[in-house]
From Swiss-Prot:
Required cofactor(s): Mg(2+)
UniProt name for this protein: Shikimate kinase
Enzyme class: transferase
This protein's record includes keyword Metal-binding: yes
Catalytic activity annotation: shikimate + ATP = 3-phosphoshikimate + ADP + H(+)
GO BP terms in the entry: amino acid biosynthetic process; aromatic amino acid family biosynthetic process; chorismate biosynthetic process
Lineage top rank: taxon: Bacteria
Pathway membership, UniProt: Metabolic intermediate biosynthesis; chorismate biosynthesis; chorismate from D-erythrose 4-phosphate and phosphoenolpyruvate: step 5/7
GO cellular-component term (any): cytosol
Subunit structure, as described in the record: Monomer.
Binding note for cofactor: Binds 1 Mg(2+) ion per subunit.
Gene that encodes the chain: aroK
Chain sites annotated for binding ATP: G14, A15, G16, K17, S18, T19, R120, Q157
Amino acid sequence: MAEKRNIFLVGPMGAGKSTIGRQLAQQLNMDFIDSDAVIEERTGADISWIFDLEGEDGFRKREERIINELTQMQGIVLSTGGGAVLSKENRNYLSARGIVIYLETTVEKQFQRTQRDKKRPLLQDAENPRQVLEDLAKIRNPLYEEIADITLPTDEQNAKVMVNQIVDLIDNMNGLNGAL
């Protein structure tokens, strides 16, 4: 059997990276890691608190160190934070060390999925969260596209269907009869 390759999920908040990532890892018998959860675990603080204390720049520096470390592991499905692609280094780590899957979603669907979530520091104090999401999409979507090996829209599919599509696409990419 071939050596397992890493799978990295990128995309905006609310695209389904964590939900799909957990199920994908389970189906492929790989470890699931959420980079934001690792940051919270290591700092003992949630992302919102880190943003409040250190600002976005401080958080992004932490995130870059964690993504560098995690992408060097083998056989993982990694869900990244929505802004991880802002760092050129992160984009390089992700694209060089595994298969990058961009889970694409519309701003409208993002808004629906995130409007009651209080753990979204960039939306917490926003007067117009939908406008914030639109502004983020303009900056980040081209960066997701730049590094994506596979792009999948998540608006109309449930997680199980998405996982099966991803497995099929990876199998086709590898030509290894299901071995990653």
